UniProtKB/Swiss-Prot annotation:
Transmembrane segments: none
Source taxonomy: Bacteria, Bacillati, Cyanobacteriota, Cyanophyceae, Synechococcales
Protein name: Aspartyl/glutamyl-tRNA(Asn/Gln) amidotransferase subunit B
PROSITE patterns: GATB
GO biological process: glutaminyl-tRNAGln biosynthesis via transamidation; translation
Family listed: Belongs to the GatB/GatE family. GatB subfamily.
Subunit-level organization: Heterotrimer of A, B and C subunits.
Enzyme's top EC category: ligase
Catalytic activity, reaction form: L-glutamyl-tRNA(Gln) + L-glutamine + ATP + H2O = L-glutaminyl-tRNA(Gln) + L-glutamate + ADP + phosphate + H(+); L-aspartyl-tRNA(Asn) + L-glutamine + ATP + H2O = L-asparaginyl-tRNA(Asn) + L-glutamate + ADP + phosphate + 2 H(+)
Summary of the function given for this chain in its UniProt record: Allows the formation of correctly charged Asn-tRNA(Asn) or Gln-tRNA(Gln) through the transamidation of misacylated Asp-tRNA(Asn) or Glu-tRNA(Gln) in organisms which lack either or both of asparaginyl-tRNA or glutaminyl-tRNA synthetases. The reaction takes place in the presence of glutamine and ATP through an activated phospho-Asp-tRNA(Asn) or phospho-Glu-tRNA(Gln).
Length: 494
């Protein structure tokens, strides 16, 4: 319990996350059985998955590569030598009654990532979150509780072992998180990094990324940690945030009313928006870890590490900084553009084709992203190719067409592709920038509205906006706005 001497201090939450990332290999971690999601239950099992007598596991080398690359992206130190251990526990989803994991010699330790936190009603801030370790392990099967609301009152349970033996990278953060929002942003950044690397799709709905939250509260930053509670069953970043916020309030209330906090595992109930007790929390000694006798030591040479490091892409945080510092984008635009690698790649291709970065960002984060999302497209499938968007941006930037005209032709370009310049030329949609042509239209407008002209010259100068509107209406929005205003000002003051 938090120290009594700290009662004058505000409560502070202490949060750490265990993030389980399914590595996107075609076969499982120790066997050639398929990892395809959504197939008939219990069709991707074999003697190794079930631990039948006489079978031996063999480490999938692609799993090792993906785990090391993930660790490098999280700035972890890669161990030259590590090993696998058996974690003993009895549960229906564990066919061997033990899980092959890594205990005291994981593949990587001691790293950190930078997280951008956007708290509602507050300024966005950067926070460095320490990462204790990343280790490899095999996933368990999946229990399906039938007959009622998940565990509560279910009449029977079914077990699907298709997931058993799928490769996991478990990423354990340090207890550096202080709010539910920070926890959600951290988990989101982990997924973003894994997707950039291509080592996992991070699909939370399919269980490709799952988070367990460890949370306690204390009186101020110098007080000892309180009793830690683990929370499971959160399948979205929003659920992570809400579960943390609920549990923080629950624990503070318990301490203030003298109710003991039990070290336990609790489930997040999305329907009721609360956490519920599931079981007492085991300690490491309960699992009776010992080195797996069927698997030899894991060795990653310096040459192999450097070879894999050379294959890493530019990561989200580095992109965000570059977009802001070198391209002059706002923090918001940099964040949106780097959220998914395909969008960032599309943006960079547009800028690489000569488009102004800020204008390109506006179009991509606005109309184009809306079209991609509403039609469930990938950027690779989008008919409007990056070089053609660059062409449209250059037409706008060069004063050849207005933003209004660009919006009019955009739906066709998004659906069919093609050249913006060709469409503009074919349909005569270019900006009217001939002073004589605009002057003739202005003379016509002034002659048609003598009362407004007299009122303007009598001091109602805001009427210039009326004339600009009439001019744009008459030209279909094609008159050069700057030139039109200059000519109108000159004519109205005569």
């Amino acid at each position: 319990m938090p120290a009594p001497a700290a009662k004058d201090q505000a409560w502070e939450a202490v949060i750490g996350l265990e993030t389980h990332v399914q590595l996107g290999t075609d076969s499982k971690i120790f066997t050639a059985a398929s990892t395809t999601f959504g197939d008939e239950p219990n069709t991707h099992i074999d003697p190794v998955v079930c631990g039948l007598p006489g079978t031996l596991p063999v480490l999938n080398q692609k799993v090792l590569e993906y785990a090391v690359k993930a660790a490098m992206a999280l700035n972890l130190n890669i161990a030259e030598h590590s090993k696998f251990d058996r974690k003993q526990y009895f549960y229906p989803d564990l066919p061997k009654n033990y899980q092959i994991s890594q205990y005291d010699e994981p593949i990587a330790e001691e790293g950190c990532i930078e997280v951008e936190v956007a708290e509602k009603g507050k300024d966005t801030y950067l926070k460095t979150i320490g990462i204790e370790r990343l280790h490899m392990e095999e996933d368990a099967g999946k229990l399906v509780h039938a007959g009622s609301d998940r565990l509560a009152g279910s009449t029977h349970s079914l077990v699907d072992y298709n997931r058993a033996g799928v490769a996991l990278a478990e990423i354990v953060s340090k207890p550096d998180l202080r709010t539910g929002r920070e926890a959600a942003e951290y988990a989101s950044e982990i997924r973003r990094i894994m997707r950039y690397l291509g080592v996992s799709d991070g699909n939370m709905q399919e269980g490709s990324l799952r988070c367990d939250v460890n949370i306690s509260v204390r009186r101020g930053p110098d007080a000892p940690f309180g009793t830690k509670v683990e929370i499971k069953n959160m399948n979205s970043f929003s659920a992570i945030q809400k579960a943390c916020e609920y549990e923080i309030k629950r624990q503070i209330k318990a301490y203030e009313t003298g109710e003991p906090i039990v070290q336990e595992t609790r489930l997040w109930d999305e329907g009721k928006q609360l956490t519920k007790s599931m079981r007492s929390k085991e300690g490491a000694s309960d699992y009776r870890y010992f080195p797996d006798p069927d698997l030899g030591p894991i060795e990653v040479s310096a040459d192999q590490r450097e070879s894999w490091r050379a294959e890493l892409p530019e990561l989200p945080a580095a992109k965000r900084h570059r977009y802001a510092d070198e391209l002059g984008l706002s923090q918001y635009d940099a964040r949106v553009l780097t959220d998914e690698r395909p969008m960032a790649d599309y943006f960079e291709a547009v800028v690489g084709a000569g488009a102004d970065a800020k204008l390109a960002a506006n179009w991509i984060t606005g109309d184009i992203a809306a079209h991609v999302n509403s039609n469930r497209l990938s950027y690779a499938e989008l008919p409007f190719r990056p070089e053609k968007l660059a062409e449209m941006v250059q037409l706008i930037d060069g004063g050849k067409i207005s933003g209004k005209i660009a919006k009019e032709i955009l739906p066709e370009l998004l659906e069919k592709g093609g050249s913006p310049k060709a469409i503009v030329d074919e349909r005569g949609l270019g900006i009217i920038s001939d002073p004589a042509a605009i002057e003739a239209i202005v003379d016509e407008l002034l002659g048609a509205h003598p009362d407004e002209v007299e009122a303007f010259r009598g001091g109602k100068t805001k009427l210039q906006g009326f004339f600009v509107g009439q001019l744009m209406k008459k030209t279909g929005g094609k008159a050069d706005p700057k030139l039109a205003n200059q000519i109108l000002s000159k004519k109205l003051k005569v």
